[in-house]
Amino acid sequence: DDHDEHGDHEEHGEEHGEERIFSSTDQESFTAKGQYNLSSNFLKSIEYTYRDTDYELVEAHAEEEGHDDHDDDHGEEHAPTIFTNDATEYGAIFDISTDNLIQKIAFNFVDEDSAIVGEESFMNPANNEEFTFGYFLSADLDAFYLDAGFRLDQIERTGSVTDEDHGDVDYYNLDDDTNSFAISLGRDLTDSLNMNIGFASVERLPSVIELYMNGPHLATGRLETGNPNLKGETSDNFDITFNYDDGDFFAMASFYINDVDNYISLIDMHDDHDDHDDEHGDEHGDEHDEEFAHLIKANYVQEDAEFKGYEIEIGRTFSLGSGDMTVSFGRDDVEAEFSDGHNVPRINPARNIYSLSYVENDWLFKLSLKDVEKQDDIAEGETVTDSYQMLNARLTKVFNMNGAGELKVTIFGTNLLDEAARNHSSFVKNEVPLPGRNYGAKFSFKF
């Protein structure tokens, strides 16, 4: 990201005038899954999962020209910021289905350590432990299809926040339970048309970043500050969906409304919100503000919010030659407002998606055009994002290796129109556009 705000400081003008941010990611993950089938009348099977993940993201300053010639002092001034996340997860699902009911009980445990460190402690090491119990039920009640689920989470999150001025450390512990449930009823209206109505209530506690973050996040261009006093979110969602399929013609329409109490969002702070008490403006604080003056101050805050939107799709399948061709049109849109009437930030605009696909034996060709509309229904402090069209294509061939396995080869092209496109939901949409025209190939082998 280019930053020109330091040009007024003669001693920093040369150093920061052409500053850019570079990042690298290193992740190691090991996953083991299995299933044990039983002949018991009560317990049909047990699925089990173990996953261990080590993740590291390094964000560093670098000069566009001559960045290798800086002295040691300058190198220390721009020491990298390192995001780490080490997680271990265990899970098991017990199938206790009967002839009339599908029933499953799930247990899951996660132990996660996170930290964001650099020249200063941007987020001190934090620990997150979660134990989950879940129950799922599915039944055919003749007149309706019923799906229902319940989930209980026991969560403990511990962390600390270091005062940027005086270095004092405050320790925090969040220990709470959340309860969530969902239920849906489906009904066949005709042989080709069915309807589904669903309701879900989901509780979510703030993450360790939302609670304890306290420093610069270069990839978002923000000086982020969490809040250890954030409350949990409660989301109540109602949706209704219609599906039609007569073998050739198909259509889908889904509508939803989602009320979220205590919705947590990262909100940019503007000049009229950035006043600080003079008695705390010591030399260290001034240096801290000057060092990160090119970043936008942003706080994790919460307020009640409402999301409402829809998704539709229509299409038809034709026989063509020795294969089938499918054409379709889809559209989705969402509106989101806080309880005070202001728009929720970084909400993507409406999209129209045109698709064409052709399948013949082991060949698949797909062409899609995504028409993303202009987003001018924006939140406070946001800027309008222009519309764009994204044309993608891919051709896939599957080779059967004489019983030894299956080789899948895909040739693809994305953004074939080479549009200068920007994602409205991105914190750095102006500095980092979506990738331009590119081509590639993918290979996968299953045995």
Regions inferred by a protein language model and the residue ranges of each:
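Surface-exposed extracellular loop regions of Gram-negative outer-membrane beta-barrel proteins
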Residues: 54, 154-168, 173, 191-238, ...
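Outer-membrane beta-barrel "beta-signal"
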Residues: 241, 434-447
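Face-selective signature of the C-terminal outer-membrane beta-barrel domain
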Residues: 25-188, 194-196, 200, 252-255, ...
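Outer membrane beta-barrel strand-and-loop segments of large Gram-negative receptors
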Residues: 75-93, 134, 225-231, 237, ...
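Periplasmic-side early beta-strands and strand-to-turn transitions of outer-membrane beta-barrels
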Residues: 1-30, 40, 57
